[in-house]
């Protein structure tokens, strides 16, 4: 920075550095800002008004996932019996543990739903 000038008072002399030129901002159209704001609010509205899955859909989807884990375990086990070199034992063990855990969780959910239903129907 090169000094532009000096400021002097009775005790000191100050050198004033040059200021960097501030970039000019072109004209801003209010309409372009509004369009960007509308675009943002549209995205928010879509996220907020997104249809939620019903309890039935959520439950069926979870049971489908449990079924997929069971099928994957069966396939890996069968593949291990037919061609042991093509499958890692660790993968089979992990798949079995995931399938077992998901089945236990599904059973717990079913038990809780039935208990809640029985409580509601008998609470006349």
UniProtKB/Swiss-Prot annotation:
Protein keywords: Bacterial flagellum
Pfam family, one: FliE
A Gene Ontology molecular function term of the record: structural molecule activity
Protein location: Bacterial flagellum basal body
Gene Ontology biological process terms, A to Z: bacterial-type flagellum-dependent cell motility
One GO CC annotation: bacterial-type flagellum basal body
Residue ranges the record marks as coiled coil: none
Cited InterPro entries: FliE
UniProt keyword Transport present: no
The keyword Lyase is assigned to this record: no
Family label: Belongs to the FliE family.
Matches recorded under HAMAP family: FliE
Protein name as catalogued: Flagellar hook-basal body complex protein FliE
The organism of origin for this protein: Treponema pallidum (strain Nichols)
Lineage: Bacteria, Pseudomonadati, Spirochaetota, Spirochaetia, Spirochaetales
């Amino acid at each position: 920075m090169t000094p532009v000038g000096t400021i002097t008072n009775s005790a000191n002399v100050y050198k004033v550095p040059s200021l960097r030129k501030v970039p000019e901002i072109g004209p801003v159209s209010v309409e372009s800002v509004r369009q960007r704001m509308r675009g943002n609010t549209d995205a928010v509205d879509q996220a907020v008004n997104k249809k939620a899955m019903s309890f039935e859909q959520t439950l069926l989807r979870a049971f489908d996932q449990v079924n997929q884990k069971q099928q994957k375990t069966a396939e890996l086990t069968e593949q291990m019996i037919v061609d042991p070199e093509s499958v890692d034992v660790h993968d089979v063990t992990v798949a079995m543990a995931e399938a077992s855990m998901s089945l236990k969780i599904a059973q717990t959910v079913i038990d809780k739903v039935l208990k809640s239903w029985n409580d509601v129907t008998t609470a006349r």
